[in-house]
Amino acid sequence: LETHHVIPFGSSWWWGGWLIFAVYGAVVFWIGKSATEATRERFERWWGWVILGFFAFGQFYQVLDGSWSLQESLPLHLCWFSRFLAVLYLTFRQKWALVPLFFWGIVGGFHSFLTPESTLGSSSFMLVEYYFSHAGIILVPLYSVFVGGWRIPANGWLQAFFWNNVLLLPIYLINLAVGGNYMFLVAPPVAENPFVVGEWPYYILGFEAAALLHYGVLRLIFFNYLLPKRATA
């Protein structure tokens, strides 16, 4: 069975992904802005459960169609970590999760829409799941800022970059143990991306530079939403 599936730029599924993102975003922001505080809190908890449910059903779906494997199906890509951070914030009210989620989710999610590569196959369900999950990791941190009033720590971009690097060694060792390519630490992604240059291990240095650049730019874009210096997150 096909596992890695690159969605061509400008194809029907590529545009369909952006449509899913737009509808998804419109719905959650409309609910968040129009609901009472109590209703909004219930909605957020259920939103987290839905995100987690999509993950669980995706794993079950792979088991049923025989495509589940240690090499491809473990939730060890950065976008998967972002999904769990979203659940921790929405359902379990863990605000600390927002700092890495804001930077990992928005940057990783954006590139997952721009140059989409499904690592779990090309079935219609897995493509919808791909777009739903990546839309979520963009929308949850944006929702937390524009609906929840959360403010970003001034050094949050450096915190996110630090935890990026903390994950590298354990994920690389897991890759060696199971023969996987989680976080693309063994081989570059198949989808073309201008920030992926060279072979192993040199393209990883490009990942590092691109992450720091993207996080810094995101901090500048959201400069007016930074946490005041004397406040705490």
For each predicted feature, which ranges?
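Membrane-interface transmembrane-helix boundary segments in multi-pass integral membrane proteins
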Residues: 5-22, 159-162, 166, 176-215
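Structural signature of hydrophobic alpha-helical transmembrane segments
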Residues: 14-21, 66-79, 99-102
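Hydrophobic cores of alpha-helical transmembrane segments in multi-pass inner/ER membrane proteins
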Residues: 17-29, 80-91, 133-147, 203-222
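Membrane-interface helix-boundary motifs at transmembrane edges
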Residues: 33-44, 91-97, 147-158
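A glycine-rich, hydrophobic loop/mini-helix early in the fold
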Residues: 40-90
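Aromatic-anchored segments of alpha-helical transmembrane domains
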Residues: 51-60, 105-116, 164-174
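Membrane-interface helix caps and helix-loop-helix hairpins in membrane proteins
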Residues: 63-72, 92-96, 116-128
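A contiguous pocket-lining binding segment that forms or flanks enzyme active sites
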Residues: 114-164
